[in-house]
Amino acid sequence: MFDIGFSELLLIAVVALVVLGPERLPKAARFAGLLVRRARTQWESIKQELERELEAEALKRNLENAQQVIHDAQAQLQSNQQDMNIQNSISILHEQTKRDIHPDRNTNTLELGTAVHHVHVTSPPPSTSTHGNNGQEKSQ
């Protein structure tokens, strides 16, 4: 606290002995010791309080940093959830659009390995009747 060496302390004691005398010196020394002790305890008290405040500030900063990290993580999760919802909606709309464009593909889908049978349809033979008599032949 004070940068006082032994030689300076001895000089102060000699001056105090000369000024106060041998009768009042012990009482003054006790009083000076009491003042020094009070000053040290006050200094230690202030120092401890300051350290507690600094620790409290550090804890508050750490808590705020942790809350910010949590907030950022929640925002990222919400963004990812919205992206997933959008992707699901797009997928559903894609499937609905495919069904609307090609409705027969969904109902008549063929599995691999099934045979496909082709049926040939021919038109009926042309009729020999004349068109003017409504399908009846002329008799002569």
Swiss-Prot record:
Q: Where is it located?
A: Cell inner membrane
Q: Can you tell me where the transmembrane regions are?
A: 1-21
Give the span(s) annotated as Disordered: 119-140
Bias regions of kind Polar residues — which residues?
Answer: 128-140
**Does the record bear Protein transport in its keywords?**
yes
Tell me the domain of life: Bacteria
BP GO terms, sorted: protein transport by the Tat complex
Which is one GO molecular function term here?
Answer: protein transmembrane transporter activity
For this protein, the record's InterPro entries field holds: TatA/B/E, TatB
Which keywords are on file for this protein?
Cell inner membrane, Cell membrane, Membrane, Protein transport, Translocation, Transmembrane, Transmembrane helix, Transport
Q: What is its main location?
A: membrane
Please provide one cellular component term from the Gene Ontology annotations of this protein.
Answer: TAT protein transport complex
- Record-annotated disulphide pairs: none
Membrane topology is: Single-pass membrane protein
User: Sorted alphabetically, which Pfam families does this protein's record hold?
Assistant: TatA_B_E
Q: Which family does it belong to?
A: Belongs to the TatB family.
Subunit (UniProt): The Tat system comprises two distinct complexes: a TatABC complex, containing multiple copies of TatA, TatB and TatC subunits, and a separate TatA complex, containing only TatA subunits. Substrates initially bind to the TatABC complex, which probably triggers association of the separate TatA complex to form the active translocon.
Protein's job: Part of the twin-arginine translocation (Tat) system that transports large folded proteins containing a characteristic twin-arginine motif in their signal peptide across membranes. Together with TatC, TatB is part of a receptor directly interacting with Tat signal peptides. TatB may form an oligomeric binding site that transiently accommodates folded Tat precursor proteins before their translocation.
What is the protein's given name? Sec-independent protein translocase protein TatB
Q: What species was this sequence derived from? A: Xylella fastidiosa (strain 9a5c)
